[in-house]
Curated annotation (Swiss-Prot):
Homodecamer. Disulfide bonds: none annotated. It is found in: Cytoplasm. It comes from Streptomyces avermitilis (strain ATCC 31267 / DSM 46492 / JCM 5070 / NBRC 14893 / NCIMB 12804 / NRRL 8165 / MA-4680). One of its GO terms (cellular component) is cytosol. Its EC number is 5.4.99.62. It is an enzyme of class 5 (isomerase). GO terms for molecular function: D-ribose pyranase activity; intramolecular lyase activity; monosaccharide binding. Gene3D superfamilies: RbsD-like domain (3.40.1650.10). Substrate binds at residues 28, 96, 118-120. It catalyses: beta-D-ribopyranose = beta-D-ribofuranose. GO terms for biological process: D-ribose catabolic process. This is D-ribose pyranase. The active site is at 20 (proton donor). The gene is rbsD.
Length: 129
């Protein structure tokens, strides 16, 4: 049995398949999920697991070279804004509708139980060398 890191077998397997440039959308429970990308739905109930918990767990496992979020997060969700700006100083902000369009090209979507608005970020995978 695995003793550390991400224990969810579906998520761990999906992460192992990612390569340079692939997109990973980490989203709240309300984000529309497009048809096409692989989805790992971790939502259990409202707020569980949180966006922050899932994002930090993923950042422990992934090399990220870029991140994009909806600009609406700045006014609608100060907590998520602070979290994203701390984790990604070069965070790119786009209109929410554009983020939804970009998510259709993600390789993986990880849905959380987050129940605060605009707690979504599209990560672009980097390489460790």
């Amino acid at each position: 049995m695995k003793k550390a890191g991400i224990l969810n077998r579906h998520l761990a397997g999906a992460l192992a398949e990612l390569g340079h440039g692939h997109g990973v959308l980490v989203c709240d429970a309300g984000m529309p999920i497009p048809v096409g990308p692989r989805v790992v739905d971790l939502a259990f109930r409202a707020g569980v697991p949180s966006f922050a918990e899932v994002l930090d767990g993923l950042l422990d496992e992934l090399v990220v070279e870029g991140a994009t979020a909806a600009r609406e997060v700045r006014e609608a969700n100060p907590g998520a804004t602070a979290l994203l700006q701390t984790r990604f100083p070069a965070l790119e902000l786009v209109p929410h509708e554009e983020l939804k369009s970009l998510s259709a090209n993600a390789r993986l979507i990880v849905r959380t139980g987050e129940a605060r608005p605009y707690a979504n970020v599209l990560l672009r995978c980097g390489v460790f060398f």
